């Protein structure tokens, strides 16, 4: 999701690539039911300390702002209205980033969602993450100290 499209619902995904066969496998994200979807910006893949066949995947999710709407609206209209409201909020507030944590078993075709980490005062504009092998912590960078403002689009062009 670009700096000018902080309201788009993320249709991104995580995939594996097997260089010996040239096969790309789009992984199903089990247990990840965010209405804002996944908009991966950066990620780290770390071998598990408890199982040699398991990986922990940390993903920066540059998701749009959360919008609660009247559930009595018909589904098609509700989604259109949600995107319209999210677009307006994104221009004022910027994206609502998170760090998503998944587990992956080698050779599998899915990842299991473990956690969503977010804090509007700390997870401000992350663009890189380095996860811990135990799946319980990570380091991440915030190259910009704010989510919106007149200077942000200019900084975003250089990051």
Regions found by a protein language model. Give the residues of each.
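A generic structural micro-feature
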Residues: 6-9, 91-93, 154-157
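A short loop-to-beta-strand structural motif that recurs across blades of beta-propeller domains
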Residues: 2-15, 98-100, 159
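Asp-box/WD-like beta-propeller blade repeats and closely related beta-sheet repeat scaffolds
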Residues: 26-135, 141-149, 153
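Surface-exposed loop/turn elements that mediate protein-protein interactions on large endomembrane-trafficking
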Residues: 16-23
């Amino acid at each position: 999701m670009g700096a000018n499209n902080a309201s788009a619902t993320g249709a991104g995904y995580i995939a594996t690539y097997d260089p010996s066969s040239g096969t790309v496998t789009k992984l199903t994200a089990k247990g990840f039911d965010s209405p804002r979807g996944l908009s991966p910006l950066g990620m780290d893949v770390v071998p598990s300390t408890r199982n040699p066949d398991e990986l922990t995947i940390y993903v920066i999710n540059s998701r749009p702002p959360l919008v609660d709407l009247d559930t009595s609206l018909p589904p098609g209209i509700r989604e259109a209205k949600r995107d319209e409201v999210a677009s307006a909020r994104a221009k004022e507030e910027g994206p609502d980033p998170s760090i998503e944590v998944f587990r992956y078993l080698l050779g599998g075709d899915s990842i299991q969602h473990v956690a969503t980490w977010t804090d509007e005062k700390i997870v401000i504009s992350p663009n890189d993450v380095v996860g811990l092998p135990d799946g319980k912590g990570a380091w991440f960078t915030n190259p910009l100290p704010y989510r919106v403002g007149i200077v942000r689009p200019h900084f975003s062009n250089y990051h």
